[in-house]
Design a protein with these regions (language model features):
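Conserved class I S-adenosyl-L-methionine
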Residues: 1-44, 57, 61, 145-173
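Class I SAM-dependent methyltransferase SAM/SAH-binding core
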Residues: 57-101
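A short acidic, Gly/Pro-enriched loop at the edge of an enzyme's catalytic core
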Residues: 103-113
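A short SAM/SAH-binding and catalytic strip from SAM-dependent methyltransferases
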Residues: 112-126
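A short glycine-rich, Lys/Arg-flanked "PGG" loop and its adjoining helix->strand segment in the class I
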Residues: 129-141
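Short alpha-helix
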Residues: 186-203, 209
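A C-terminal cap/extension of S-adenosyl-L-methionine-dependent methyltransferases
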Residues: 208-262
Length: 262
């Protein structure tokens, strides 16, 4: 716990996640896609729990839309920013909390549970299963859960084809190209089938796996990348029509595993 908290805390203390989501086409697409799937599965006024809510990009927007939102965040730095942004906003309760311990939350308390960040930073198989189990426990039977995760193949394409491809392979794969997960990784990526298999022993039914931002992180690295507003809106429509296609998932940096509790 302390090692994970130190690694993640140092990163988010100096990284402006809100700017990535709000000011980059990749972040905008990730946000639009995630909100699209939330709206598909959450009834108006539903009780939502966001675990690992960061500075509140989703939880504040959802509370403003009339949802009853509880937002849990591990890092006090992020929690304080969210308190400042949401001052006076009804329908939102922000608390410090860890995805591995939701003991303050009752069984089946929420219509929908959002886990949109913690799985990026969990490496130990026991902790991964604990986070999944806790999210399922606090969701009502028939309720929907969204788990965000990272594609290891997108990590390779986006971060290591810059003169350090050999290091990227050593960092993310074993000799047989099995995906590695270890505490020193700031972000851990998954093979998509590997992530989906994590849920096989839990009382849930998979609804879909969707690409949240598609190829936009890779594309935005091009010097000639340009996606004006009108072009972007067209790309959003294309993306939402194709983001569940299996052949396109691996290029997406961020993905959503969406399931329903039995």
């Amino acid at each position: 716990m302390h090692k994970r908290l130190d690694i993640v805390g140092r990163f988010y203390a100096q990284y402006d996640e809100d700017s990535r989501v709000e000011a980059t086409r990749q972040g905008q697409m990730e946000y639009r896609t995630t909100m699209e799937y939330i709206h598909r599965h959450a009834q108006p006024g539903a009780r939502l729990l966001e675990v690992g809510a960061g500075t509140g990009r989703y939880s504040i927007a959802l509370a403003r839309e009339g949802y009853d939102v509880t937002a849990l965040e591990l890092l006090e730095h992020n929690l304080e920013q969210r308190r400042q942004k949401s001052a006076g906003l009804s329908g939102l309760r922000a608390q410090q909390g860890d995805a591995l311990d939701l003991s303050r939350v009752e069984d089946g308390e929420f219509d929908m549970t959002l886990v949109l960040g913690p799985m990026y930073h969990l490496y130990d198989p026991i902790e991964v299963r604990t986070a999944i189990r806790e999210a399922i426990r606090v969701t009502k039977p028939g309720g929907v859960m969204l788990f965000a995760f990272l594609s290891v193949y997108a990590i390779m394409g986006n971060n290591y084809l810059k003169g350090n491809a050999r290091y990227g392979i050593q960092e993310n794969f074993g000799p047989d190209f099995r995906v590695l997960h270890f505490p020193e990784q700031l972000f851990t990526g998954y093979d998509i089938a590997e992530f989906e298999a994590l849920f096989e022993d839990f009382p849930v039914r998979q609804l879909t796996t969707a690409a949240a931002d598609g190829i936009l992180e890779l594309a935005s690295g091009r010097r000639d990348f340009d996606l004006p507003d009108e072009e972007f809106e067209g790309w959003v429509r294309y993306h939402l029509a194709t983001c569940e296609k299996r052949e396109l998932l691996g290029h997406s940096s961020h993905l959503l595993y969406i399931c329903r509790k039995n």
